[in-house]
From Swiss-Prot:
GO molecular function: protein-disulfide reductase (glutathione) activity; sodium channel regulator activity
Disulfide bonds listed in the record: C23-C26, C79-C83
Record organism: Mus musculus
Residues recorded as bearing N-acetylalanine in the entry: A2
Pfam family, one: Glutaredoxin
Cellular component aspect of the GO annotation: cytoplasm; mitochondrion; nucleus
Official protein name in the record: Glutaredoxin-1
Example GO biological process: positive regulation of membrane potential
Subcellular location: Cytoplasm
Amino acid sequence: MAQEFVNCKIQSGKVVVFIKPTCPYCRKTQEILSQLPFKQGLLEFVDITATNNTSAIQDYLQQLTGARTVPRVFIGKDCIGGCSDLISMQQTGELMTRLKQIGALQL
């Protein structure tokens, strides 16, 4: 169930972030990504606490990405990590490059 839930969210051409709304790193990640000009429907924040499988979802994220912490940021099918990874990519310009590569932005 958790595996299906996560796998159906992750899609090429889309940015998906698995979050918990009370997490300050999740809020920072949402703030950063929400300022970018995404095409409609290509940025999704998934609140894993809204399911009754939060722990199982985090276990599967651990299996898939090597970490069970949130946020878990996927650009297309690739997990780039969490908030600090996103900030690093933003500072180097790699974030915009990757988002343009998958066609997620309105330019």
